[in-house]
């Protein structure tokens, strides 16, 4: 029964997880939170991760009831993500693997989300909507690859929401997306915003530029409230995501949809996806914030699958890749 330790730190979340044969034994996590109206810089984020990662490692082992001798493999996020945070975590993973004399595995962050979603929900072969601060992709499995059927052609949906939160000076604690979601529940007026879908691809830079341009004027003149803008932005960008997911499901003949990534925690997105799936006679699968937000257990789970399939990452190849495509990885652990 192999036990895999996973390190995740591709953005402002740092997590260490332990997975053994499909069971999550530990999954502690910390978040680097910045003041309202600001984002997080790579260097500052990396310094935060370095300051807490060893405490998280000890916390994970204690929670799992394991020692270093019980761990069979060390997995870490190879990419995609922000360079400095990725490097800070990869250095610790390499060091731990050498100190404990354990094999090392570099894991694709996106595949970590997918494998954790499959594990937690029991979805067998879903069309995946992967939505986060750094990625927006519609994915389906075929011939040992997670194939990207559609994606953003500019910025990720989570990045769009985060940057809008800065315009309104919305708090980053616990996350700007969560706070937008709560404000949107009180919105009553739908403001017409640009809607850009091109086949199975989407674009969010136009809607962000538009709402950045008009937000302060509309608020100053009383045309709408901040809550109305949050509501309108959510409804518009989520409708775009539902459309391209449904198109991919129709193309693949899929009867399952799985939402993964930090934006996947949004209840309104889940409701809209559920409506679409019901109309197609399909099933929707989603996880809660423990597993849809970046976490160490998802890297451990993907690492576990790779470890069982015989994958290993030599030290000479254990760097990071900021632009690590989902479809670059050969998925040898699935039929």
UniProtKB/Swiss-Prot annotation:
Question: Where does the chain bind substrate?
Answer: 130-134, 162, 177, 181, 266
Catalytic activity from the UniProt record: L-threonylcarbamoyladenylate + adenosine(37) in tRNA = N(6)-L-threonylcarbamoyladenosine(37) in tRNA + AMP + H(+)
Which UniProt keyword terms apply here?
Acyltransferase, Cytoplasm, Metal-binding, Nucleus, Transferase, tRNA processing
Q: Give the GO biological process terms.
A: tRNA threonylcarbamoyladenosine modification
Q: Which cofactor does it need?
A: a divalent metal cation
| InterPro entries to which the protein is assigned, alphabetical | ATPase_NBD, Gcp-like_dom, KAE1/TsaD, Kae1_archaea_euk, Peptidase_M22_CS
UniProt: a divalent metal cation binding residues: 109, 113, 130, 294
CDD domains attached here? ASKHA_NBD_OSGEP_like_euk
Give GO cellular component annotations, separated by semicolons.
cytoplasm; cytosol; EKC/KEOPS complex; nucleoplasm; nucleus
Report the SUPFAM superfamilies cross-referenced here.
Actin-like ATPase domain
Q: Which GO molecular function annotation, any one, does this entry have? A: N(6)-L-threonylcarbamoyladenine synthase activity
Which EC class is the enzyme in?
transferase
Give the cofactor note. Answer: Binds 1 divalent metal cation per subunit.
Q: What is its EC number?
A: 2.3.1.234
Compartments (UniProt record): Cytoplasm; Nucleus
Role, per record:
Component of the EKC/KEOPS complex that is required for the formation of a threonylcarbamoyl group on adenosine at position 37 (t(6)A37) in tRNAs that read codons beginning with adenine. The complex is probably involved in the transfer of the threonylcarbamoyl moiety of threonylcarbamoyl-AMP (TC-AMP) to the N6 group of A37. OSGEP likely plays a direct catalytic role in this reaction, but requires other protein(s) of the complex to fulfill this activity.
Per UniProt, subunit arrangement is:
Component of the EKC/KEOPS complex composed of at least GON7, TP53RK, TPRKB, OSGEP and LAGE3; the whole complex dimerizes.
Tell me which family the UniProt entry assigns to this protein. Belongs to the KAE1 / TsaD family.
Record-given protein name: tRNA N6-adenosine threonylcarbamoyltransferase
Q: Which organism is it from?
A: Bos taurus
Taxonomic lineage = Eukaryota, Metazoa, Chordata, Craniata, Vertebrata
């Amino acid at each position: 029964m192999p036990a895999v330790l996973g390190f995740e730190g591709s953005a402002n979340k740092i997590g260490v997880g332990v997975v053994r044969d499909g069971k999550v034994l530990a999954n502690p996590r910390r978040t680097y939170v910045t003041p309202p109206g600001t984002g997080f810089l790579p260097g500052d984020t990396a310094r935060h991760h370095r300051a807490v990662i060893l405490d998280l490692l000890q916390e994970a082992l204690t929670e799992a009831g394991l020692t270093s001798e019980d761990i069979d493999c060390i997995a870490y996020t190879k990419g995609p993500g922000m360079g400095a945070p990725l490097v800070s975590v990869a250095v610790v993973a390499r060091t731990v693997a050498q100190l404990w004399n354990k094999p090392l595995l570099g894991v694709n962050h996106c595949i970590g989300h997918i494998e954790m979603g499959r594990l937690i929900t029991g979805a067998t072969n879903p069309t995946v909507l992967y939505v986060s601060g750094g990625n927006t992709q519609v994915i389906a499995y075929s011939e040992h690859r997670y194939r990207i059927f559609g994606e953003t052609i500019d910025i990720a949906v989570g990045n769009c929401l985060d940057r809008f939160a800065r315009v309104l000076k919305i708090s980053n604690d616990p996350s700007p997306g969560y706070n937008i979601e709560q404000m949107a529940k009180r919105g009553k007026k739908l403001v017409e915003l640009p809607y850009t879908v091109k086949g199975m691809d989407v674009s969010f830079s136009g809607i962000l530029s538009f709402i950045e341009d008009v937000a302060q004027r509309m608020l100053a003149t009383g045309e709408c409230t901040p809550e109305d803008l949050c509501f309108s932005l959510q409804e518009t960008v989520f409708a775009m995501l539902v459309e391209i997911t449904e198109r991919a499901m129709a193309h693949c003949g899929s009867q399952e949809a799985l939402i993964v990534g930090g934006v996947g925690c949004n209840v309104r997105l889940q409701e809209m996806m559920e409506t679409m799936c019901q109309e197609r006679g399909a099933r929707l699968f989603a996880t809660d914030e423990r597993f849809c937000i970046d976490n160490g257990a998802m890297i451990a789970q993907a690492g576990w699958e790779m470890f069982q399939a015989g994958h290993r990452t030599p030290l000479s190849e254990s760097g990071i890749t900021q632009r690590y495509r989902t479809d670059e990885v050969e998925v040898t652990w699935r039929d």
